[in-house]
Amino acid sequence: MSDQINEYTKPKGLENVGATCYMNAVLQCFYHVKPLSSELIHYNFPNLSVNQIPMTLAFLDVVKNLSSGNNNPARPILFKNVISVNPLFTGIQANDSKDLILYFLEKIDQELTFLNYFSQNKFFFNAIKTMPKVFKPELQYIVELFMTNHKSIFSDLFYGFMKQTITCSKCHQELTNYQIFNFIIFPIETVYNSKKNNNKNNNNYKNISKSTYSPYNMPPAGKPSYTSNSEYGNFYNNYNNNNKSSNIYKNANYGSYDNNNKSVSLIDCFENEIDDINFKGDNQIYCNKCNKLLDAKGKNIIFSSSHVLILILNRGKANKFECDVEFEEDLDIKKYVENKECPTKYKLIGVISHLGESGMGGHFIADCRHFDNKWYCFNDSIVSGPSNHYNKKGIPYILFYLNEKYI
């Protein structure tokens, strides 16, 4: 096996070990995050077993097998066995790549934090230096709490901070919350309707994904907030059994995708995400200065961006909303990031696409920018390419963007 990853590393497929196309697509995209794979391939845990750090060793096994010199597809049976302890990923029913990404990031970050395996980036602490002084104590507390519980290359690369400012309509007091995210979900139907009707949705902040450190008791202005760690708990164990199917290819349709002339851009998605939020009616905000529920306005912005942006183009499960999403290989989000010292320019490195009429079944593939800077399509064990640019196949579902300095 090779002990390094570079432009000479050959692209390899992954065997389907039982309706695992959703898993293989995710693994290919994470593997093609070069700063991640390049560091992990040197990790060695001689005194630890798969029972102690199962997700870490399973992913490391994938990285090393995909980096080996032979041309045979890698067999990710260890990874499949590890995720099968979660009922959501047991058996051969249809599964969603998004759910695996969430579960994978949570578990492997926990394991590496426990081992204290972390890089020296200290990205989040550097972000504090440019924070307005009035908010520094609040943010510093959240950052330090975060860094206590997340000490791995995954938290360094994939995690960022979202900032929300809420202004009371009566006293105009501003309250600022910070939430940690490791991917962002864009509701495509909402984005399309907002663009079409110029009537923005007022509830998009719920689409930020990840356990968050968010104030549950709004403090007076300028005072530190008190935080609670809102975890997913039994989300996976309580997953809707109706999402299961005995055959993942049941609803597959490999024909052309008719978008009915509906389209939005990735920039439209970001615009919708940071647009003003109106808290009215049942969504009123409690103002501790006015001592009652009142209308309020909110504003979202990315405070500190992550080195890897994972963007979910959510079209629904049972009946996918048919709308083309236009995106480029080069992405600049400077307009949507408050801390300009954070990454704002990215390169597209991976696209997970869905083939099929319904989100309840179908087939997942991954297109990735390989380490030779060429694009390849990974359809389980079949690898096609190379190409100089990403070529759309199926319906793009999950986008991976990497800080351009790592390309």
Residue ranges with predicted function:
Residues 15, 166-169, 285-288:
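Cys/His/Pro-rich metal-binding microdomains
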Residues 21, 168, 311:
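Carboxylate-rich, divalent-cation-coordinating active-site regions
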Residues 16-29, 54, 58, 92-103, ...:
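Active-site nucleophilic cysteine motif
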Residues 8-16, 87-91:
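A short glycine/serine-rich beta->alpha loop
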